[in-house]
Amino acid sequence: MYIRSLELRDFRSWPELKVELKPGITIFIGRNGFGKTNIVEAIGYLAHLSSHRVSTDAPLVRANAGDARISAVAVNQGRELAAHLLIKPHAANQGQINRTRVKSPRELLGVIKTVLFAPEDLALVRGEPAERRRYLDDIIATRRPRMAGVKADYDKVLKQRNALLKTATIALRRGYGTEEGAAALATLDTWDGQLARLGAEVMAARFALVQDLSSQIRDAYQTIAPESRPAAVNYKTTIDQGLAQFGEFDAGIIEATLLTELAAKRQREIERGMSLVGPHRDDLELHLGGQPAKGFASHGETWSFALSMRIAEFNLLRSDGTDPILILDDVFSELDAGRREKLVGIARDAEQVIITAAVSDDLPANLADAITARHTVTVRDTDAGRISLLDEQPDTQP
């Protein structure tokens, strides 16, 4: 798979961008703050419907613009598809495939497949469980786009259930002794059933993915850092003890176990006003030689683990039959010679690679002969603010 053309309108610092791309390695060079990362962020957003830098859409829309637009034409095994996304910070986003508007932007998932490695990926190792859950859920949605809808439905149910636990605490505590309490508990029972059903689907998909990823991550880490301790991953849930008796993780068993645990934790949840059971509290545990990577990994080991997770993601998507687009956002300057060499080897073998760097000297020397296109990102200060430009010199006039 590769992107043949990319167009942006009012996306961050880009009032307009039109660029033709080819298979092979494309480089975007520009000083920090000039807007090169905004280009790859847009591609990643079109692929995953989320940014690797921010959690809301508002920062993606250029100042004083009402919305932003991302358009790309992707070529997959000779077939072209055009994906368009209109980002509205104060309304629902709109998606389009070729000339047909889709009911939900989630229908764009899978049209463009990317794996993005960026300095922010250190949070996969050092950050909170939410970072690692998102890592799993993004891969699942890329491979099985329907699951993005399941996850979105789960999040809605979770929000409603938490709202009930917070706002109806007194009624829930009174229980069936009052009409108000009985009604609140009946509503909670309804949310429990939906939380368990949808949560079981999410967790079953994560279990299956981790089973596929674990050996890939282990082998990638061993290749990147052969002198280090062995890497391992484990999906930890809030119902591990209940699942242990079954030894398998299909959705039916998970749903029944979730319902049992929800019943056991009900009083605690009412007292605390929050949902304590479900995939929203799970984690992908990372280990090095039996110790948690978070807190025990050195800086170099942290980079190696994060990189191995992205390599595993790339290899897994490739095994599904399509090379994802590999995006390397300003990472070569952060890596030592050994890790740079491993990454160059992967880049040379991928169908399309998009790399950003502050200066050409940040790029490994053994990458030069494989580069198919090189672009320069500059800026210009205007009355409407600073804007990014591609392959132009900045305006030096007062």
UniProtKB/Swiss-Prot annotation:
Entry-linked Gene3D superfamilies: P-loop containing nucleotide triphosphate hydrolases, RecF/RecN/SMC, N-terminal domain
GO cellular component terms listed in the entry, alphabetical order: cytoplasm
Lineage: superkingdom: Bacteria
InterPro entries registered for this protein in UniProt: AAA+_ATPase (IPR003593), DNA-binding_RecF (IPR001238), DNA-binding_RecF_CS (IPR018078), P-loop_NTPase (IPR027417), RecF/RecN/SMC_N (IPR003395), RecF_2 (IPR042174)
Record: residues binding ATP: 30-37
GO annotation terms (biological process): DNA replication; DNA synthesis involved in DNA repair; double-strand break repair; SOS response
Stored Pfam families: SMC_N (PF02463)
UniProt keyword Metal-binding present: no
GO molecular function ontology, one term from the record: single-stranded DNA binding
Main location: cytoplasm
Location in or out of the cell: Cytoplasm
Keyword Magnesium: no
SMART domains named in the record: AAA
Keywords: ATP-binding, Cytoplasm, DNA damage, DNA repair, DNA replication, DNA-binding, Nucleotide-binding, SOS response
Family (UniProt): Belongs to the RecF family.
Function: The RecF protein is involved in DNA metabolism; it is required for DNA replication and normal SOS inducibility. RecF binds preferentially to single-stranded, linear DNA. It also seems to bind ATP.
PANTHER family: DNA REPLICATION AND REPAIR PROTEIN RECF (PTHR32182:SF0)
Name of the protein in question: DNA replication and repair protein RecF
